[in-house]
């Protein structure tokens, strides 16, 4: 951006003095002049494009003097409006500040450029109808929107500009009305929600009052029927019954432990376990019936609230009894399983001992039979020896033994001594068994 004096450009309008301060309504715009940005300050709502051109030319002449290259009058130049590839020459009387504000959010994409009229268009746009127009040989539908706008007459271009301003104003109005409608909808929604919340709070207060009345009525009825201390009695009775049940359970546990220590109460434990199981089933069925009855009675009047409280206390006591009986049953079941394991172990030991006893009995019987056979054979051999000695003959058995003995003594291997030892041990065992 080339340096130049802002104060100089601020005072280049026709109806303003150089020493007058800038009003708070004054604005500024950027105009491209010879590929440089020039800031034009002091714009008002009455400033036109020809005023901006005059200020730019005066500033250029004051800056460069005789070396200036923007020659000619202000009417020989025009300001071109460029936006996203399209461009349009502004008429001299265009309110430049109004046009700049109308672009709104598209201001960063829009530029003002100072060009010479003859270089931009063959014929200026603001001349009268007496000026001879050059015919364009190109077809209108083959031209770009910017070039097509250049071919239009000035009055039609003015109408298009006015129409564009009206459309922009309408768009702004529509957006503002849409925002207002959204805000109104939100306000109505908040008000309706606040109203519903107040109604719900009021209804809750009414229900609380009705509940308090019903409770007071039930309290008076209970005082008339059961006395003034019915609450203490209702809470003290279950405690005494619970203590008695605890004592009963402790005595039953001690008894079951004694029975287990004796080892003779397995059948009794099974019976007790069956009894507790039946009791558990019975209590569970009663609890289910009570729960169903409580569910059906929930839709009745508030007069049965006291009965429901008693039933709830009974249900709680029954649940406590059920839990205690379940614990006792689990203890008994654990003791019973331990006893069964011990019985199985003792049975296995007895079976092993019985098998050992049978094996020992078989061995003993076999040894006894062999000892009897040995004794009988010995007696028979004695009788035969006596008979042979009386006849003077040597029995063949002794002869064989003698021969084997002589043969063994002649051997050098030493096996005879081993055979003799084995024979002696076997004979000694036989004699011992015989005795």
UniProtKB/Swiss-Prot annotation:
Its main location: other. It comes from the Eukaryota. The keyword Aminoacyl-tRNA synthetase does not apply. GO terms for cellular component: cytosol; endosome; recycling endosome; trans-Golgi network transport vesicle membrane. It comes from Rattus norvegicus (Rat). Residues 375-386 have a biased composition (Basic and acidic residues). Residues 25-119 form the Ras-associating domain. This is Ras association domain-containing protein 9. Interacts with PAM. Residues 400-423 have a biased composition (Polar residues). It is found in: Endosome. SUPFAM superfamilies: Ubiquitin-like. Residues 195-291 form a coiled coil. The lineage of its organism: Eukaryota, Metazoa, Chordata, Craniata, Vertebrata. Keywords: Coiled coil, Endosome. Residues 1-22, 371-423 are annotated as: Disordered. The keyword Coiled coil applies. May play a role in regulating vesicuar trafficking in cells. GO terms for biological process: endosomal transport; intracellular transport; protein targeting; signal transduction. InterPro entries: N-RASSF, RA_dom, RASSF9_RA, Ubiquitin-like_domsf. Testis, kidney, skeletal muscle, liver, lung, brain, heart, pituitary gland, adrenal gland and ovary. One of its GO terms (molecular function) is enzyme binding.
């Amino acid at each position: 951006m080339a340096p130049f004096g802002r104060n100089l450009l601020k005072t280049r309008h026709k109806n303003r003095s150089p020493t007058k301060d800038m009003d708070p309504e004054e604005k500024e715009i950027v105009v491209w002049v010879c590929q440089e940005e020039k800031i034009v300050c002091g714009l008002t709502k009455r400033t036109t494009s020809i005023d901006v051109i005059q200020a730019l030319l005066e500033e250029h002449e004051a800056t460069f003097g005789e070396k200036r290259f923007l020659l000619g009058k202000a009417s020989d130049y025009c300001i071109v409006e460029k936006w996203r590839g399209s461009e349009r020459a502004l008429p001299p009387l265009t309110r430049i500040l109004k046009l700049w504000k109308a672009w709104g959010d598209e201001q960063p994409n829009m530029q003002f450029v100072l060009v010479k009229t003859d270089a931009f268009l063959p014929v200026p746009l603001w001349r009268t109808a007496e000026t001879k127009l050059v015919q364009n040989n190109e077809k209108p539908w083959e031209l770009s929107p910017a070039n097509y706008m250049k071919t239009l007459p000035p009055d039609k271009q003015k109408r298009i500009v006015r129409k564009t301003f009206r459309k922009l104003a309408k768009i702004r109005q529509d957006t503002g009305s849409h925002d207002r409608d959204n805000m109104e909808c939100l306000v109505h929604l908040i008000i309706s929600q606040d109203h519903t919340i107040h109604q719900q709070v009021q209804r809750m207060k009414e229900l609380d009052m009705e509940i308090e009345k019903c409770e007071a009525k039930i309290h008076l009825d209970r005082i008339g029927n059961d006395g003034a201390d019915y609450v203490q009695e209702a809470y003290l009775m279950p405690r005494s019954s619970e203590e008695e049940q605890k004592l009963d359970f402790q005595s039953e546990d001690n008894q079951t432990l004694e029975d287990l220590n004796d080892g003779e109460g397995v059948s009794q434990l099974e019976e007790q376990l069956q009894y507790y199981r039946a009791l558990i089933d019975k209590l569970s069925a009663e609890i289910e019936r009570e729960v169903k009855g409580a569910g059906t009675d929930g839709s009745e009047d508030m007069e049965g609230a006291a009965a429901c409280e008693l039933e709830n206390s009974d249900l709680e006591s029954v649940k406590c009894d059920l839990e205690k009986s379940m614990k006792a049953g689990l203890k008994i079941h654990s003791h019973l399983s331990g006893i069964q394991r011990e019985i199985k172990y003792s049975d296995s030991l007895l079976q092993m001992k019985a098998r050992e006893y049978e094996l020992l009995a078989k061995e003993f019987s076999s040894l006894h039979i062999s000892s009897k056979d040995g004794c009988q054979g010995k007696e028979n051999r004695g009788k035969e020896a006596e008979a042979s000695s009386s006849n003077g003959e040597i029995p063949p058995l002794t002869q064989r033994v003698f021969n084997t003995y002589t043969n063994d003594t002649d051997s050098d291997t030493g096996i005879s001594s081993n055979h003799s030892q084995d024979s002696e041990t076997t004979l000694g065992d036989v004699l011992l068994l015989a005795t």
